[in-house]
């Protein structure tokens, strides 16, 4: 946060409580205002960094409140080690600004809250820009372990709703990252209307995904003009971020759908062990890792010249909500499970032999396959391998989910698949290749979406600024 901001909270594990840690209640709270917002232009920027509309969103779209004092702008410095916590989160911080958005090659955190939004009818281009500025300002604070504004959860007027909901007070940053994306319908809506003058700026590659084998998509779990991916090592920190960003957007966007995730199903760094999905197998062994800079340049980041220019340094995100038929899978023999996946369940080694990271051999036979390759040609490993997909690789960043149970008492559980790629065709190619996957018998795709992920915000700028400049 800008060093000139008044009432600035201190950095560290206890930063969320910040300027309300000591002193009497009277000393901590500004004097009540008669109504400083109602008589001012709602489009005018708030002095604390949030626009007046952003503050009105926090206050319930019309209630009076206290604007936080201080300078705008939100240059961020990377920092780590903010102290101990009684919660699962850590003091690790990742900067909000940078060449790329955080939350892509960042080491995958343990928890996710993902949300998709539609822009409300009647919202103008200027209001959309203002929303992105508000979201960027608030996110730049949240990733430091701060409240969404300087007055925060308990430092504002006692006669107005707090700016911040407060459930993350006292918690460290917990490696929080907040990543934003723009869907095809932001540029041209479902009726073909260019609401924000962005049609000419839409990436040619940003179109609705084709229908795939196994799709049973529900519209209420798919699409969205905008998306926000909040990842953290503490679930309360991730939920707090989405909750408060949704409040800031009140009156300008509507929450379309959201998904909670736990237990990452991929590693994005060589320092991380390969996790397991709900089928019990190691997942994402061959994932693109952050340390593979040549691979991220080739497969993840949109390069200058790929088009459009405003997206250079960004990526494309595909989300798929995949329900796993848990009860059916649990009755499958271990040997058959391994044949379906193409890997050993204990160590994750390919059935052709070796260890987890041994390159699969799709020709070698085994003593039990009677002249056939050890790895079935229709196994998941075989069909998803780059060798079978013209070299296409994805940076996967998915999570497990359990959303209760259905009317038959079966777990509504599965994989919330997230992949980042330089070109959506990479995902399409792999997904079409998986049409004969033996695993499909146990999967149902119920949600889907695609978004362009703009490059990172510059210091003092906002996410998406290159799109509107």
Model-based region annotation:
Residues 1-50:
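N-terminal secretory signal peptides
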Residues 49, 54-469:
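Long, histidine/aromatic-enriched segments associated with O2/redox biology
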């Amino acid at each position: 946060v800008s060093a000139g901001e008044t009432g600035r909270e201190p950095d560290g594990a206890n930063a969320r409580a910040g300027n309300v840690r000591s002193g009497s209640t009277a000393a901590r709270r500004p004097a009540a205002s008669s109504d400083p917002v109602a008589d001012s232009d709602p489009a005018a920027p708030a002095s604390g960094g949030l626009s007046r509309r952003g503050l009105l969103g926090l206050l319930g779209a019309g209630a009076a409140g206290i604007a936080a004092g201080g300078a705008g702008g939100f240059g961020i410095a990377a920092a780590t080690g903010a102290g101990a916590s009684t919660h699962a989160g850590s003091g690790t911080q990742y900067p909000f600004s940078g060449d790329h958005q955080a939350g892509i090659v960042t080491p995958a955190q343990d928890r996710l809250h993902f949300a998709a939004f539609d822009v409300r009818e009647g919202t103008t281009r200027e209001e959309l820009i203002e929303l992105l500025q508000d979201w960027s300002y608030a996110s730049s604070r949240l990733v430091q372990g701060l409240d969404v504004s300087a007055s925060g959860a308990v430092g504002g007027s006692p006669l107005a709703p707090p700016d911040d909901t407060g459930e993350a007070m006292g918690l460290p940053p917990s490696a929080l990252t907040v990543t934003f994306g723009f869907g095809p319908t932001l540029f041209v809506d479902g009726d073909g209307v260019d609401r924000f003058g962005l049609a000419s700026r839409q990436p040619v590659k940003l179109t609705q995904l084709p229908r795939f084998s196994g799709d049973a998509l529900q519209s209420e779990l798919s699409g969205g003009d905008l998306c926000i991916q909040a990842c953290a090592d503490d679930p309360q920190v991730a939920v707090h971020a989405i909750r408060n960003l949704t409040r800031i957007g009140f009156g300008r966007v509507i929450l379309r759908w959201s998904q909670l995730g736990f237990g990452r199903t991929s590693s994005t760094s060589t320092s991380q062990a390969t996790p397991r999905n709900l089928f019990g197998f190691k997942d994402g062994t061959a994932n693109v890792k952050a340390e593979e800079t040549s691979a991220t340049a080739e497969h993840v980041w949109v390069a200058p010249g790929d088009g459009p220019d405003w997206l250079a340094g960004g990526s494309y995100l595909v989300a798929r909500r995949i329900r796993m038929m848990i009860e059916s899978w649990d009755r499958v023999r271990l040997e058959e499970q391994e044949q379906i996946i193409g890997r050993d369940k204990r160590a994750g080694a390919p059935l052709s032999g070796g260890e987890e990271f041994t390159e699969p051999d799709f020709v070698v036979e085994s003593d039990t396959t009677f002249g056939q390759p050890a790895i079935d040609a229709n196994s998941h490993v075989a069909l998803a391998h780059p060798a079978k997909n013209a070299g296409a690789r994805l940076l996967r960043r998915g999570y497990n989910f359990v959303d209760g149970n259905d009317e038959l008492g079966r777990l509504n559980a599965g994989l919330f698949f997230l992949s980042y790629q330089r070109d959506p065709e990479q995902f399409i190619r792999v997904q079409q290749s998986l049409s004969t996957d033996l695993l499909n018998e146990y999967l149902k795709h119920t949600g889907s979406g695609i978004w362009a992920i703009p490059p990172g915000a510059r210091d003092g700028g906002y996410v998406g600024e290159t799109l509107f400049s």
